[in-house]
Curated annotation (Swiss-Prot):
Cysteine sulfenic acid (-SOH) PTM sites in chain numbering: 286
Protein name: Betaine aldehyde dehydrogenase
Annotated K(+) 1 binding sites: 26-27, 93, 180
Gene3D superfamilies on file: Aldehyde Dehydrogenase, Chain A, domain 1, Aldehyde Dehydrogenase, Chain A, domain 2
UniProt KW Oxidoreductase keyword: yes
Source organism: Escherichia coli O9:H4 (strain HS)
Gene behind the chain: betB
Top enzyme class: oxidoreductase
GO MF entries: betaine-aldehyde dehydrogenase (NAD+) activity; metal ion binding
Free-text remark on how the cofactor is bound: Binds 2 potassium ions per subunit.
Active site (record annotation): 162 (charge relay system), 252 (proton acceptor), 286 (nucleophile), 464 (charge relay system)
């Protein structure tokens, strides 16, 4: 693909130049080619976007629930009509295989938008009787202007996961995509406008997180910030949001999730789940189950099943329908993953497979890392303690149920967890003791629109998806009505 035209900001229903004068480049990580130069939003641009959003939000919130629902449903239809076009752009920008982006990224994002479009008319208050002459009623009102700050691994899906409930509740959103993968969020803004969303209700500000993101989190005109990213960045966002105007926050942060295989499990099923929990999207999924606990007596058999499945991984041309493994999202990220792999070897973990970059025709110019499996791992190893966010699996062994529960919970993270077992009683007994917000039994990775997702401990605050997320984009107003004569003590 030839280099795209310079990308601008999207404010008040159309493209506009950044006043900052700064730009950055977005790269195709499969081959290292520059996709586009992108303008970076500065402080004045954030001010413009907030004013635009404030104007648009008043118009949007004044519409009936059915009017808002119809507009969002039109956006869903356009997303599905343009699935292939958007998936191709997402593949170019992220490096993910087209077989993945065309069946997951836009599809699941559109599903979430459709889900919230359907919930809009059901967003209701309540009536509370006090006595014969008095009652209270409540209203769920929009927060106003909210900000979404996205991560680079699922650009358009995250933009939809954040904007769908926010818009459904009557808010306007200013969205800052990751500077690594900014392109499809701009296309989403076009689609919202085409569907009939009032100008200003969804503005997109590409830019560097330390600048554009900070301006958003500090801005007094922003009522809430929804952030997806790393723990360290999330803490800064939260601190800025509280210090500036006591904003509400939703934080979807990192994970180092355990996948526990029990001795009664079907090892073929367990190996299939472990592969998806580590190598789907080249390991760049926040919920990945990278700490794979297996009974000591099952270790050798499990390792052989993993090795057989690694042989089935098809890396290569990301637009080949048979390819199911792409490069990492950027060269700096590739180098960081390679540092972790080197650290694992240095600390004594044994490389079962991988452990280096992929080499040869089609790989040498891209950010490719081979699917890597470590075994003989210990809980104190860096690769077991820290989030790598790449195609790196760590296999650990255990002896008893109590032991593995304790070790699985021995982490600052608490995003996800999963178990594989044929024992229904054990499944629920163990899951109820795991300190994680998203749990799977005999499966991994699915996050449907109806399912609230979010983390315990350092993995986040609040939830995305589900009914409770729609409610989190509202504020409750309580009104008491007195029908009898008011009695004063004065």
């Amino acid at each position: 693909m030839s280099r795209m035209a310079e990308q601008q900001l999207y404010i008040h229903g159309g493209y506009t130049s950044a006043t900052s004068g700064r730009t950055f480049e977005t790269i195709n990580p499969a081959n290292g080619n520059v996709l586009a130069t992108v303008q970076a939003a500065g402080r004045e641009d954030v001010d413009r976007a907030v004013k635009s959003a404030q104007q648009g939000q008043k118009i949007w919130a004044a519409m009936t629930a059915m009017e808002r629902s119809r507009i969002l449903r039109r956006a869903v239809d356009i997303l599905r009509e343009r699935n292939d076009e958007l998936a191709k752009l997402e593949t170019l920008d992220t490096g993910k295989a087209y077989s993945e982006t065309s069946t997951v990224d836009i599809v699941t994002g559109a599903d979430v938008l459709e889900y919230y479009a359907g919930l809009i008319p059901a967003l209701e208050g309540s009536q509370i009787p006090l006595r014969e002459t008095s009652f209270v009623y409540t209203r769920r009102e929009p927060l106003g202007v909210v900000a979404g700050i996205g991560a680079w691994n699922y650009p358009i899906q995250i933009a939809l996961w954040k904007s769908a409930p926010a818009l459904a509740a009557g808010n306007a959103m200013i969205f800052k995509p990751s500077e690594v993968t900014p392109l499809t969020a701009l296309k989403l803004a076009e689609i919202y406008s085409e569907a009939g969303l009032p100008d200003g209700v969804f503005n997109v500000l590409p830019g560097v997180g330390a600048e554009t993101g900070q301006y958003l989190t500090e801005h007094p005109g922003i009522a809430k910030v929804s952030f997806t990213g790393g723990v360290a960045s999330g803490k800064k966002v939260m601190a800025n949001s509280a210090a500036s105007s006591l904003k509400e926050v939703t934080m979807e942060l990192g994970g180092k999730s355990p996948l526990i295989v029990f001795d009664d499990a079907d090892l073929d099923l367990a190996a299939d789940i472990a592969m998806m929990a580590n190598f789907f999207s080249s390991g760049q999924v926040c919920t990945n189950g990278t700490r794979v606990f297996v009974p000591a007596k099952c270790k050798a058999a499990f390792e052989q099943k993993i090795l057989a499945r690694v042989e089935r991984i098809r890396a290569g041309d990301v637009f080949d329908p048979q390819t199911n493994f792409g490069p990492l999202v950027s060269f700096p990220h590739r180098d960081n993953v390679l540092r972790y792999i080197a650290k694992g070897q240095e600390e004594g973990a044994r490389v079962l497979c991988g452990g280096d970059v992929l080499k040869g025709d089609g790989f040498d110019n891209g950010a490719w890392v081979a699917p890597t499996v470590f075994t003989d791992c210990r809980d104190d190893m860096t690769i077991v303690r820290e989030e790598i966010f790449g195609p790196v699996m760590s296999i650990l062994t255990y002896e008893t149920e109590d032991e593995v529960i304790r070790r699985a919970n021995d982490t600052d993270y608490g995003l996800a967890a999963g178990i594989v077992t044929a024992d229904l009683n054990r499944a629920h007994r163990v899951i109820h003791q795991l300190e994680a917000g998203i749990c799977w039994i005999n499966t991994w990775g699915e996050s449907p629109a109806e399912m609230p997702v979010g983390g315990y401990k350092h993995s986040g605050i609040g939830r995305e998806n589900g009914v409770m997320t729609l409610q989190s984009y509202t504020q409750v107003k309580s009104i008491q009505v007195e029908m009898a004569k008011f009695q004063s003590i004065f």
